Amino acid sequence: MRRWRWKMPATSTLAADVTQTVTAHVAGRVAQAFPRCRALILTGSAARQEATIARRPECVYWLSDLEFLVVVSDSENVGLTGEVLDELAATIGKDLRSQGLHIKLELTPAPERYFARIRPHLFGYELKRCGRQVFGDVNYLDRIPSFDWRSIPLDEAFRLVSNRLIELLELRLEQDRRSLAEQFYAVTKTYLDLLTALSLPAGSYAPGYQARFGARRAVLQWAVEQGCSLPASFLGNLEIAFQFKLDPDSRFHFLWVNGQQDLPAALEREGLRCFWDELPEAALAVWRWFASRLAGRSESCQEDPPHVYPVWARLRGWSRLLLHADPIPRLPLAARAVRLFPHGSPRSLVYSCGARLADPHAGAKEDSLAWVSRFLPLPTPNRHADWRELAEACVSIWRRHLRHSHA
């Protein structure tokens, strides 16, 4: 195959030019390496023209994920196909890095039937309105049912906030393996998605960070009036996050110092330490507010996990968890499912455990660790596990079973 050479765009519209060039390259590679692909669809921030791309002397850094849906036949084994596409994405990413573009590429298989079955949720809404089909004879985006964003259930916002909390745990576990810019982007994304989540019940949701940011003051005022206890610095931190999201080169040169992984120290030198320190408080305030609303009472403050999902969702969640579990631990996991079923679904329990562990003040205390050991859906929980062990287990379950699923 002809070796592809990366060329730096010379225009001021760096992100748009990089997105167009890389999308065309990925499309060619996927079509050649995976001929069973029936269509390729660009999703996420790149499709919304909101990719976070920084030009540095040594490299171009694509900090947000570059995400594609690879449409396959309904008869495909999605699990095996996913493994093949993961390898292909890694190969393409490695080739791009060798040409001066640091990027994380995701190729996710999507059976043809998937699109017609999409129900109202945030990803489906943005896919319908912002997704871009790169190639394919059938327009699969037209198959997505049309729905108003007001029909998106509140638990979608709760799911978004919960996923960002788990990613904060992931960041704390991997902090010494990520660059300053990668860490800062993870924090940035969390701030922006807290606004996304609140914009849904506030009646100001729109498919794009720029539109939601424009309504930020009204959304935050509404949230405070509704009892969501946000830190006083949240608005200022949100504005920092938005600036970095769309313009990571302007005032953030300190993030590109080689060999440094201590983001809190770097932020303190720049007078931005509260951007890091106050995020857990803000995220937990929003999480508890949504949990309370969904549970119908202030269960987030009680000993039992908040009951945010109905019984049918618990049944579906536990069934899928047991179905996809490894054979050896399946029996003890089934016994644990019986004990934990009254307390919630695997999703709600993982989210509740993640929220406990993410608390910077109480997360590592003995009673919090005991609580997480009690409710985390593991086959054989370790009653003496420390914070790191439990956080790693929580993140592992989320990655394997919950991250890309609604079950």
What is each PLM-predicted segment?
Residues 6-12, 71, 175-177:
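Glycine- and acidic
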Residues 14, 18, 76, 80, ...:
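Conserved aromatic-histidine-acidic binding/catalytic patches
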Residues 149-407:
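Conserved nucleotidyltransferase catalytic core and NTase-mimicking acidic/glycine-rich helix/loop elements
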Residues 79-141, 160-167, 181:
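Conserved catalytic core of two-metal-ion nucleotidyltransferases
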